[in-house]
């Protein structure tokens, strides 16, 4: 099984050098790395032009960027990674084991840990992991992975401005329950620190509640930004 790791970016010049260093071992393990730019203006794309990394360009919008990357991918497994999230060292092996030929699941996600100074971020990450196990809904911060055939069968990511990960999870859980890898991905807590942990918690829950009530993602995206 070959893994294609798809990373949407937009103006991530400060993060790119460390991201590339984190991904080099996976390149050496024959993972395909596809970075899809959404119109960066800070030189991000030029920084990525190294052997082993494929650069694609798409219109702005994370869902659209990930779909473009998936269309380009040659792997049998797709792993969608946010630019500010770090995979564990053996991520490729863990994913292959999770989706082995005798597995009943066609998709899954990692546990997540939110990095940052506030101790409350550990609690937030813990609650995210519990919620995913109970609801079978994963978020992009948890590095969703899926067999490419099932991703295509589910219709790919809906090209909306927000909640595309929730919609994909809803479609995939009809096909099978997700596999949760107990190892952790580490995602940045910068948004939480800038805007305040409790303020961000309330915002996220309000957005999810409003989305559940039927408010379009296009209307919610402005509040998220």
Ranges and model annotations:
Residues 170-225:
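Hydrophobic helical membrane-anchoring modules
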Residues 37-45, 85-86:
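A conserved acidic beta->alpha catalytic loop
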């Amino acid at each position: 099984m070959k893994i294609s790791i798809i990373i949407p970016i937009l103006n991530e010049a400060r993060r790119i050098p460390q991201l590339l260093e984190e991904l080099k071992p996976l390149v050496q393990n024959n993972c395909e790395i596809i970075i899809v730019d959404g119109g960066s203006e800070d030189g991000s794309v030029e920084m990525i032009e190294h052997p082993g990394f494929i650069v694609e360009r798409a219109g702005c919008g994370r869902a659209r960027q990930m779909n473009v990357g998936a269309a380009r991918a040659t792997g049998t497994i797709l792993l969608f990674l946010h630019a500010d999230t770090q995979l564990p060292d053996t991520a490729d092996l863990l994913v292959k084991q999770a989706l082995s030929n005798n597995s009943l699941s066609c998709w899954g996600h990692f546990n997540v840990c939110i990095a940052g100074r506030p101790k409350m971020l550990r609690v937030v990450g813990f609650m995210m992991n519990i919620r995913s196990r109970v609801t079978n809904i994963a978020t992009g911060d948890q590095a969703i992975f899926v067999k490419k055939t099932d991703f295509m069968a589910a219709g790919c990511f809906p090209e909306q401005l927000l909640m595309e990960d929730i919609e994909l999870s809803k479609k995939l859980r009809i096909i099978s329950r997700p596999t949760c890898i107990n190892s952790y991905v580490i995602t940045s807590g910068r948004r939480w620190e800038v805007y305040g942990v409790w303020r961000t918690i309330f915002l996220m829950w309000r957005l999810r509640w409003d989305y559940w009530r039927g408010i379009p993602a296009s209307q919610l995206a402005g509040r998220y930004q």
